């Protein structure tokens, strides 16, 4: 599986390089893969961006990875759309781990939005090698939690806990 992820990462980066030929736009991209619907946080942030920056386009791409084999094949094509939007936006806001981590040197500013529930569970690097987590090799192949410029959280009280996972 690690080999497959590494090959996929090379392919995705090659496609991303092609998409970077297109101009960057005044656009904020929201990516979410845990659900097909945006969270209230995403909608509120999108609305505030629209209010403060009416000339900035906002794009929501919310789609969970399907369970079926053919659904996963279809999701690969959806990822191409994500790559194009990523290559042509100025800011991307992530609600969960996403394709951005697989890209080497993404062009836009990358913001990871973390919900307060994160202090109630272990995640990311704090679970490597444990039952609920990935192996170190898999985490490295996925480039888990890489490429973030900023991480949004509910407050300063969450910082130490979140640093363990990132």
Feature roles, as predicted:
Residues 29-166:
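Active-site and donor-binding regions of nucleotide-sugar-utilizing enzymes
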Residues 1-35:
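Membrane-proximal basic amphipathic "stem/tether" segments
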């Amino acid at each position: 599986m690690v080999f497959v992820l590494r090959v996929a990462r090379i392919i995705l980066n090659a496609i991303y390089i092609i998409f970077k030929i297109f101009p960057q736009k005044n656009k904020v991209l929201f990516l979410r893969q845990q659900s097909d619907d945006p969270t209230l946080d995403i909608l509120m942030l999108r609305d505030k961006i629209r209010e403060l920056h009416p000339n900035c386009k906002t794009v929501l791409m919310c789609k969970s990875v399907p369970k079926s084999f053919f659904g996963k094949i279809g999701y690969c094509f959806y990822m191409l759309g994500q790559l194009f939007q990523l290559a042509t936006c100025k800011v991307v806001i992530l609600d969960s781990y996403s394709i951005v981590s697989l890209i080497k040197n993404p062009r836009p500013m990358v913001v990871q939005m973390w919900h307060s529930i994160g202090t109630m569970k272990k995640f990311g690097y704090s679970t490597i090698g444990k039952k609920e987590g990935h192996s170190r090799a898999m985490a490295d192949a996925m480039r888990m939690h890489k490429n973030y410029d900023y991480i949004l959280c509910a407050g300063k009280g969450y910082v130490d806990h979140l640093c363990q996972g990132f």
